[in-house]
UniProtKB/Swiss-Prot annotation:
It comes from the Eukaryota. It comes from Mus musculus (Mouse). Residues 85-170 form the PNT domain. One of its GO terms (molecular function) is RNA polymerase II cis-regulatory region sequence-specific DNA binding. This is Protein C-ets-2. Residues 262-290 are annotated as: Disordered. InterPro entries: Ets1_N_flank (IPR045688), Ets_dom (IPR000418), ETS_fam (IPR046328), Pointed_dom (IPR003118), SAM/pointed_sf (IPR013761), Transform_prot_C-ets (IPR016311), Transform_prot_C-ets-2 (IPR027276), WH-like_DNA-bd_sf (IPR036388).
Amino acid sequence: MNDFGIKNMDQVAPVANSFRGTLKRQPAFDTFDGSLFAVLPSLSEDQTLQEVPTGLDSVSHDSASCELPLLTPCSKAVMSQALKATFSGFQKEQRRLGIPKNPWLWSEQQVCQWLLWATNEFSLVNVNLHQFGMNGQMLCNLGKERFLELAPDFVGDILWEHLEQMIKENQEKTEDQYEENSHLNAVPHWINSNTLGFSMEQAPYGMQAPNYPKDNLLDSMCPPSATPAALGSELQMLPKSRLNTVNVNYCSISQDFPSSNVNLLNNNSGKPKDHDSPENGGDSFESSDSLLRSWNSQSSLLDVQRVPSFESFEEDCSQSLCLSKLTMSFKDYIQERSDPVEQGKPVIPAAVLAGFTGSGPIQLWQFLLELLSDKSCQSFISWTGDGWEFKLADPDEVARRWGKRKNKPKMNYEKLSRGLRYYYDKNIIHKTSGKRYVYRFVCDLQNLLGFTPEELHAILGVQPDTED
């Protein structure tokens, strides 16, 4: 047995005897070419131990030998979250200095205040603020490449990331508000009287009505979500002749086709009041005709018994929307159309109701009436049997169907309930106190639909809700 504890070397390694020899120790480095380490700096060179490397000189020019891990989408997400947490400190500065959340609205001074905050936050040096002597709109229009040229080295990406995050957050907030407010853009004001705060004396047929305060008129007809910029861009699309005068015809139940020519817009009209920020919702209309239809449905200028017609806005108005039809109830309107209610179909189809009221796109309150008048939907929404009160037995299902109708896959009950809350101030729908998911129509549905609650309940087979 040798020193290595092996009894017979021949049994372990049957190697030819001619190759057997004494084992010798040899440094492992002797087998490598010394040129392998030629790239390493030598202490005998000019560089000394006291020198501090810059971090750039010692980087190898051979990118293939780089062992740094690549920036993966996961690591990017982590970095983005970390930066977002750091940037949250700027929100406090925004509140203190009154800087708008939307960077597009910043003044030149507010751009400078943002850069000063970043300079202090990240301990930046040699930041030339004069290079950013511009307002927020110009800043956002720079683009990333131009922005990085103006920004200090190594921090331009961080500043641009912050700017992009603020722009994205503002866009998401605007989209959410548009989604919540879209169903109110054309709420007919015959539901809520005295909306404009003044009444209009009836002028004889063919006479021009007196001029009214133009600022209040425009503010009332344009929803808060319609910014002056969006309004101006839409008005530019209209022919000049249509900008000067818009004819609005009204009908009264007690009179035959009285008409008023209301001078809504002219060259001397006052400018609508500026809103603080388009963060309130910068809604834009799809076309000039849709803008006029929205005004027509929102600015009846009269009381509950007056309904605006479409005749002045659309020459190709269908016969179903003529004045004689709008003077009747929805029930009579359906009978006049010879459209009997089919078995298993809603008694009040939302699309037909929207056409009858002239509201344009289907509104949330119209959609709820459709569900409430459909027997197949009583498992998740139904009348309680107490007047116009109704209950959402499955609010998530109601929200899902509303999202499907409006092509909003992300719709949920939280967003739906926010939409319902907008109707509170309009006196269209109120929440029933002390009852969960229970609401009540407080507008004059009986006059609109031509049904009493009891008649509609009988048609649908609704039994009074005995639950507390």
